[in-house]
């Protein structure tokens, strides 16, 4: 089975944020972090040059947008597997839906398996991934998506099922 992409305890953990600089706008609920930003929640870790965090009406982080050259995240998805690691020029994490969008040279890998494309949409709750190549001038996808599945882990690739 595909399982979920996060340890069950991760979503119940507090979110820790550190950065060189932080600015908070109380009216908009938007906090901007810049300079060596690191966000951690349970086994999830997100690193970027800049992160913008949007708060919902309950004063909880709802959407995190990370940019950097590149922004990186990792998360332990299964105690028996290595961490899932991703990187892209921009990573948008929706804490309410559990969906991570990676765009710009997006890469996701775990235990030797990898998927690479211009954009990757990764649902931590459903355990599925949508990958797209680079759009051409007409808007259709002309770039290719690259997937590597080592023979020893063909059934453990993110999104694969038994």
Which residue stretches match the model-derived regions?
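Mature-chain termini and adjacent capping regions
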Residues: 1-162
């Amino acid at each position: 089975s595909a399982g979920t992409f996060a340890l069950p305890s991760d979503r119940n953990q507090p979110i820790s944020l550190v950065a060189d600089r932080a600015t908070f706008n109380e009216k908009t609920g938007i906090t901007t972090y810049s300079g060596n930003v690191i966000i951690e929640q349970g086994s999830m870790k997100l690193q970027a040059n800049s992160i913008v965090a949007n708060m919902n009406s309950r004063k909880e982080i709802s959407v995190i947008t990370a940019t950097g050259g590149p922004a990186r995240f990792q998360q332990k998805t299964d105690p028996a597997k290595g961490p899932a690691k991703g990187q892209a020029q921009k990573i948008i994490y929706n804490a309410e839906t559990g969906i991570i969008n990676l765009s710009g040279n997006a890469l996701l890998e775990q235990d030797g398996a990898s998927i690479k494309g211009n954009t990757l949409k990764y649902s931590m709750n459903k355990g599925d991934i949508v990958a797209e190549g680079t759009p051409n001038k007409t808007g259709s996808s002309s770039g290719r998506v690259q997937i590597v599945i080592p023979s020893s882990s063909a059934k453990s690739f993110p999104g694969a099922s038994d």
